[in-house]
Amino acid sequence: MARGLRTAGHDVTIVSRHPGYVPSKAIAWDGVRAAMPETDAIVNLAGEPLADGRWTAARKAEIVASRVDATRVVVDAIAASPGRARVLVNASAVGFYGASGDAPLDETAPAGHDFLASACARWEAAAWPAKDHDVRVVVLRIGVVLGPDGGALGKMVIPFRAGVGGRLGSGKQWMSWIHRDDVVGLVLAALGNTAYAGAVNATAPSPVRNRDFTQA
């Protein structure tokens, strides 16, 4: 993401829990407020990876807190520097909708009722107050991100390379996916085009069933 933004001409500062290990301009989370007067736009993708470990009660709490707390830090920093940042592009996920069977879903569909849906709804709720400070808020409900050298695909191919991969259950589950490069392109579009506002589904036009994806 940072590489794509720089290529497009943006001056990027990365926010990290370990800025000393980032090979580019970076600050810690406690420096976000101080950096805000020099900031025109914010892209907030922060959150613990979903696939790293079992979903124990503690792990679920960490998944939610890492997203909600980071977003609150950003919005609080925006509130402390009114009139500076013009747009916040905040990540969410298609998990917002929960299990919906074969029903098509657009951005007006309500949140689901499972854990991921609740987590996404709380994540988004933490971002919307930035609108109170004349900031255009774009919430990207991102699908499963695929790329040749990382993203979800990197973890998915491991069991297949070991000869034990296969579909999940019936394999009828829909998977809304998006290529990593398209996520970058969508973020760039959201930053530069004021027509982007509110929730936006960040997925490829045609989802696939799990059985078809695993066969591919």
Positions of predicted regions on the chain:
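Mid/C-terminal beta-alpha module of Rossmann-like enzyme folds, strongest
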Residues: 193-216
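NAD(P)-dependent short-chain dehydrogenase/reductase
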Residues: 121, 130-139, 143-175, 180
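Conserved Rossmann-fold NAD(P)-dependent oxidoreductase catalytic core, especially the SDR/UDP-sugar
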Residues: 72-114
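NAD(P)H-binding glycine-rich loop region in Rossmannoid oxidoreductase-like domains
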Residues: 20-73
